[in-house]
């Protein structure tokens, strides 16, 4: 799988993280998951790298809360279906760099991504994302 970033072009948090970590200095393929939804192969690859589909689900998503999913006993199959159903269920951004996967906006994840890219704090990139 090539180095790729799954993100929402309209998400301020995604844009902030990508700028902070200077991803524009690396040859990534960008996929806006709103206009180009994830396919089964992509979701399965992410789960294979993280060990579960659940680890890729954004449990803070409004849709997750509205459906009361936190109160349900969901299986990994259920989490896979959610990821394929709607982009809002994916923790984002997701950055695949070589054999590493970074998902979400947790400070430790963002710091690990910056380190993997060889960037230190304060070495922001331009924040430019591809025009879609």
What are these regions (language model features)?
Residues 25-27, 98-99:
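Generic structural signal for short, solvent-exposed loop/turn connectors between secondary structure elements
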Residues 27-28, 61:
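Short, solvent-exposed secondary-structure junction/capping segments
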Residues 1-22, 28-33:
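Local sequence-structure signature of Cys/Sec-based thiol-disulfide redox active-site neighborhoods
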Residues 35-132:
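Thiol/selenol-based redox catalytic cores and closely related redox-interacting motifs
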């Amino acid at each position: 799988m090539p180095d790729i970033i799954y993100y929402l072009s309209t998400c301020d948090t995604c844009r902030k993280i990508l700028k902070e970590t200077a991803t524009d200095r690396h040859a990534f393929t960008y996929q806006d998951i709103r206009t180009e939804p994830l396919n089964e192969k992509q979701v399965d690859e992410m789960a294979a790298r993280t060990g579960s589909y659940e680890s890729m689900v954004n449990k803070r998503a409004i849709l997750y809360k509205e459906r009361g999913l936190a109160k349900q006993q969901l299986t990994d199959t259920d989490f896979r279906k959610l990821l394929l159903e709607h982009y809002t269920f994916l923790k984002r951004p997701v950055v695949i760099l070589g054999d590493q996967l970074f998902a979400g906006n947790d400070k430790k994840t963002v710091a690990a991504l910056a380190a993997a890219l060889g960037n230190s704090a304060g070495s922001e990139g331009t924040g430019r994302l591809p025009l879609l």
